[in-house]
């Protein structure tokens, strides 16, 4: 709405767009709203310029401005000093100041009134009050001239003015000091700004800065005194380092407050100078004093130690330097520092670097806002090229723009904290190498002692801590899980020392960094040599598991030094540890090959060497034909033990690479061996059982080595080479099974006419499809693997693939959660109601309901999942009445979790609207408060010079203040105007949810027909926020008085009336407000509500169309890998998004068996569903925690869940269906496999019919027969 008597300034908060992926209609509404606000702002500026133009024409009769350009030119060229002045009686000035002086001395609480009066005289009556102590005369702007007071007694006026200023300064300084006690940062900044602006009105900037600097210096002194611990010989260095870290954090918060306070008051150069002199220089001085005391104590300790040991020979490098007499000068002295002291100094440097980085970021924000470019070398230099223009003072004379403005060199923040470490830098440079080499040698020696004391050495492992969580250099899938303890201890110490190298700038700390880099290289090389030595001990002196540990440890060190290089490249411009990193990379590649090669060799030469099981010529059945070979079982156990070790130690990606390669190569070996097997009649069932067992075991392992559904169901020959080869080997094994073990009569029926060359291409490649072997055994072994043509994975398959991964795969997790319209999430929500109070007390984080809500809320590409999950939940729990009547206060006795989540989501959407309404009300309230509070006394008005033409505000109150009706109408219009844009910026899932919910409720609630359930709830929440003062204060930080609450209450009643509430229909004030809106824009409210409803339903219609298209098989609309990845990235950048995903994954892990049972029950034909059980949400006992690898557990799971060997022998194979698929089998392959059949053995007794069949099959695949048939065709 346009209010002609207002200078409105409208803005659009673009951050709300980041919560969703708006569609075309939403973007159209958002851009329309932005355009409308730009037009309103332009109209407001134009109106303001017209008023200025009119005022100039009125005040200056000789000037007639016709256009906006004329107005700007006149204002730009106007010069106070060249104007004519009218005379003001000197006695009048003395009378006014005398009255003002007496008023301040004799009356209390007149300071605010005085400051407002002086400001009004300066702004509206054009009276200029000097801020300097001397040399300035009072003058005022009349219609035609400027006149300076000149009188021999002018010093009396200046003396009186100085006395008034001094009184006001004391008042303002006292306020400034009291503001430091305020806890609310935003309120403190606002109040400080007001005080400083008032001081700058009275005094020059330099004096104000000095005074404020003194105030802040006292604050800083108290902070340093209370937080900076002192140092002595018995001090705990860890406590001192922690004290400095906490002090730096508090100091940064104080600096940040002053940045925000001064950025709009002072020029950047002045502000930078203030921050530097007040805080940075002071803390540097304090650190210099601390380090001076530290050095003195260290020097004395070294001197005493040297006197005691001077007669004995020194065993440590650098001991000669410690032999310094007490008469040596202070500067340049050297002393040794033990490891704990070097670590302590490194922690101090880290604290300063963190403060430096924070202050630099604050300064960069200011430079960016002022569009000032600067050199990339940081905040530690002074730039001669950059110029920052000083901000104009309110009471200074304007200078024409055509004249060149004098520029000030911008002094960039020069934080010289490194100078405080100058005295200690030389000892640190000398001792850092000794310290690092000393502790690394000690740790390596401890590892050697452990190795020497054990016959079979199993290295001590530690879990890798998540370091550098703010770094995305190495994704989770590449980070090790466990490493050798000795390496962890060494790298932990190096991490502690790293700040010594990172602190290097230009010439400072150069020697320290050089020595540190040299020591790190020596230590890393020693660790590499130790790992190489230990790797050679496998398998003769150490188990295979150690090899995984060495590989994981090498990856850990490699990533550390890559990270070091990345952190130092800003200073060094080139990688420092390049050679070292390359050596580790080569070692990692070698170890990976060694692990893979060793595992394959073990399979080939040991595990699969099974003379008893593979005695294929034996005419006795192997265990009555009801057991597979021992070697196959051992191969299965070996693969799963390897799987366990890789999953618990190595980085997930590397673990899968190794396992898939071992699986592929061992399958290649098995396929080759079984293709060459020539079993007897009694041993042929064993071969069939062996191959079937291999295929079932491989199917079970595939879930672990495939990282996506695409790789699992449709691997590509080039991008998924290893997976594709595994399927090829399995297809070859199954080919062996079919040709070698099928009944001879069935084989003859299929191949009696030869290998059919006329078969189609689809038939030719059918038995070579990746999942062909799975489909062949699925009749007997119901695998969860399903080809895309068969509908892809079910929910059980998605769950199995997700939980088979070595880590939480975010993309796969989200895909599983969204699968089948959130089927798993619906199960979790049902079961979450059964979670015990004990479980809830153990879980201090967000609830499962909140985690599911937050995840689905931001899945903009799958709005139907959010809607279906929560609509079904609301339906089951019968919560529709709560949805119609959402509370806003958190103080309600009991609030359902899903309703609370909805309330918070909608409250966040209308927060900006509430903020704008409260801002309008607060500004109006402040206006009325100032008018009523700061009334100028009559005695002061009477003493005021008439030439000033001052008119009190009270006389223009009716003209300057809006009526009560117009204020309410403006607030209501803001709410209604913002509704469409608020809905446009809501994520599609919540809009579709309210659309479906409205269908459930519309018959019961007639009011919803006007604007829809979503609009209704937004209005209701806004009203209830306004009715609850506590919620308003929490959202906006504004405290409301009785007047504001009454006005907000009236706004609520108007909004309810618009939405159809009949209780306030007879209220005249409400009707008056609504009529005033309608008079300005007829039917505008109704159009806005219809637009909001359209935006809330359009998304729903699009979702319905999409669901229909998917049911009809439109693949383009499915959730592609790219869409899943986009939503995962969006979720991980949302506050708490990663934690919500991890929490759901953790609960799914703990309840895997229960979820499988529920999914199986839903798919079965049983009418009675399984009972709902409470979910496990925490590991409550040792039994729940994963234990070491247990082969008996694997055997039990293998025999009970995967493979019933006796049942497999009774499988009724459908040979008539299987064999025709091999009509285009290669003749050579068919010939070799045919020769290996038991019937081809010389000593086998066959019937005549069987002999004839064999002869016929031989002729089919012999080259002679092939060439003869070719000759016949040519003839």
From Swiss-Prot:
Q: Carries keyword Glycoprotein?
A: no
Which InterPro entries does this entry report, sorted A to Z? DUF4495 (IPR027993)
> Which Pfam families does the entry link to?
DUF4495 (PF14906)
Determine if Cell division is one of this entry's keywords. no
Give the UniProt keywords, A-Z: Disease variant
Which disease is given in the protein's UniProt record? Polydactyly, postaxial, A10: A form of postaxial polydactyly, a condition characterized by the occurrence of supernumerary digits in the upper and/or lower extremities. In postaxial polydactyly type A, the extra digit is well-formed and articulates with the fifth or a sixth metacarpal/metatarsal. PAPA10 is an autosomal recessive condition characterized by one or more postaxial digits of the hands and/or feet. A rudimentary digit (PAP type B) may also be present. Intrafamilial variability has been observed.
By what name is this protein known?
Uncharacterized protein KIAA0825
Task: Please state the gene responsible for encoding this protein.
Answer: KIAA0825
